[in-house]
Design a protein with these regions (language model features):
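Short Lys/Arg-rich basic patches
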Residues: 2-40, 58-84
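Surface-exposed, Lys/Arg-rich phosphate-binding patches that contact polyanionic backbones
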Residues: 20-52, 86-105
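Short, basic amphipathic alpha-helical segments that act as recognition/interaction helices
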Residues: 50-73, 103-124
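Short, positively charged interaction helices/loops
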Residues: 67-97, 117-126
Length: 126
């Protein structure tokens, strides 16, 4: 996954994006799912080779941003990305806790399943 993702401009492969789009969730929910998947894949890349445990520390995230070729020349975007990591990290940690796994063990399939279930519950309440 990492090798395929590195040929892309971001951590998500085309197949991952297609898998998200295939959910047919409403546009806003798919966008949110893509953001969470992007952050999860980034955390997993930063933590590599670790595949379980907590997400990387803020310091490790900052180091990764400073060394990433697409972020090196745009420090302001790096600051925004770190804020996004923080917000997404909280949501992903909550999901991992609900599933009884560590945050780094989360998979795209689990994110998709959670998003689809949340959309179903939202639809039933309306």
């Amino acid at each position: 996954m990492v090798e395929e993702a590195q040929s892309q401009p971001g951590p998500l492969t085309r197949a991952m994006v297609e898998q998200i789009d295939a959910t047919l969730l409403p546009t806003l929910e798919r966008h949110h799912l893509r953001l969470l998947a992007h952050c999860l894949a980034s955390f997993q890349e930063i933590a590599s080779p670790s595949t379980q445990g907590a997400f990387p520390s803020r310091e490790a995230q900052e180091e990764w941003c400073q060394g990433h070729p697409l972020l090196r020349d745009d420090p302001q975007f790096g600051v925004l990305l770190l804020r996004q990591f923080e917000a997404a990290g909280r949501q992903l940690e909550t999901l991992a806790q609900t599933l009884g796994i560590t945050p780094l063990e989360l998979t795209l399939e689990q994110l998709i399943n959670a998003a689809v279930e949340a959309a179903k519950k939202k639809h039933l309440k309306q």
